A protein has these predicted regions:
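P-loop NTPase catalytic core of nucleic-acid-dependent motor ATPases
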Residues: 1-55
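Residue-level preference for the first positions of well-ordered beta-strands
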Residues: 24-28, 89, 124
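Short acidic, S/G/P-rich loop/turn micro-motifs used as interaction or catalytic elements
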Residues: 33-36, 95-101, 131-135, 154-155
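AAA+/P-loop NTPase substrate/partner-engagement loops
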Residues: 43-101
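Short secondary-structure boundary/capping segments
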Residues: 44-47, 104-109, 137-146
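Conserved catalytic/switch belt of AAA+ P-loop NTPases
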Residues: 97-122
């Protein structure tokens, strides 16, 4: 989030081929409902000092047009990102699950590609969604998004307590830390001898210097790095894919055949992908008619 105003400048550091596409403009916080994604976005909004509102607009609230609203919303997002000279991130809550199929996927690809040829910098788009299986989307889409999985639901029995804690945190925070971060990161951008091509898991680690700055904050506060502090680029898309297969095995173990691995020391599980489509029926009215075999194979 703190790095979002600098994404355009970081992308300019990569001029060979289409390297810039490995630095996504779209950050997606996904996961199950009730896990606090919207509250997280509201807190980050206040930390960045973007607006005085205490609620981020949802996707359905971006435009008032009642006719062809979905199309008008996509056009508005395109305009904000490609036509306005702005580096403040666009924060949007509750993207619908079907956004990442068809037109929404095309929007992400088009904006990511066109941003390379823009005269001015392109802002980042940060959103939340309850959509599942985003990590299993096409490689072209996965490359253009930064997916963070937030699947820990709050205990409904402690709703009052968690609400009080949220209000307590929200009222205390301000944009002071972000303003300091902007100064520190700007200095790094002005250093000609810095190597920006750090890699993590065969992907460009565009958040490398962000983590370095936050390490400085922990040193200043004389606090050890917590166990949850990431030491490399987070890849929740891979984690999400593993969860998908785990859920499939738990729900339909009969689809899998356990065989002994030829080189591995442990057994492996095989599945006939066509069996996934056995009970699949395409809906004339549904927006997602992707066969299960395609979802899992990707």
């Amino acid at each position: 989030m703190f790095t979002s105003p600098f994404i355009g400048e970081i992308r300019e550091k990569f001029t060979l081929g289409n390297e810039a596409l490995d630095i996504p403009l779209f950050a997606i916080v996904g996961g199950t409902g009730g896990s606090g994604k919207s509250n997280l976005l509201n807190i980050l909004n206040k930390m960045l000092g973007l607006t005085t509102d205490n609620k981020i607009p949802t996707y359905n609230e971006l435009v008032d047009n009642d006719t062809r609203k979905d199309s008008a919303t996509r056009q508005q997002i395109r305009y904000w990102m490609l036509n306005e000279d702005n580096v403040a991130p666009l924060l949007v809550d509750e993207l619908p699950s079907d956004f990442f199929n068809g037109k929404g996927e095309d929007l992400i690809k088009d904006i990511s590609n066109q941003a390379e040829n823009q005269i001015h910098l392109t802002p980042a788009f940060i959103c939340t969604t309850n959509a599942e299986a985003i990590g299993s989307k096409s490689e072209a889409l996965s490359r253009r998004i930064y997916y963070l999985l937030n699947d820990r639901k709050f205990d409904s029995q402690r709703r009052a307590e968690t609400t009080d804690r949220y209000i307590e945190v929200y009222e205390k925070i301000n944009s002071g830390l972000f303003r300091d971060f902007v100064l520190r990161f700007s200095k790094k951008l002005m250093q000609d001898d810095l190597n920006w091509k750090h890699c993590s898991g065969n992907k460009l680690d565009f958040l490398y210097y962000t983590r370095e700055i936050f390490k400085e904050y922990f040193e200043i506060a004389e606090i050890e790095l917590p166990d949850f502090f990431p030491l490399s680029r987070v890849d929740d898309a891979t984690k999400n894919n593993m969860l998908m297969w785990r859920k499939l095995y738990i729900g339909s173990p009969e689809l899998f055949k356990e065989v002994k691995g030829e080189q591995e020391e442990r057994n492996i599980y095989m599945i006939k992908m066509s069996e996934l489509d056995h009970n699949f029926q395409s809906s004339r009215y549904g927006v997602d008619n992707t066969k299960p075999s395609k979802v899992y194979s990707e």
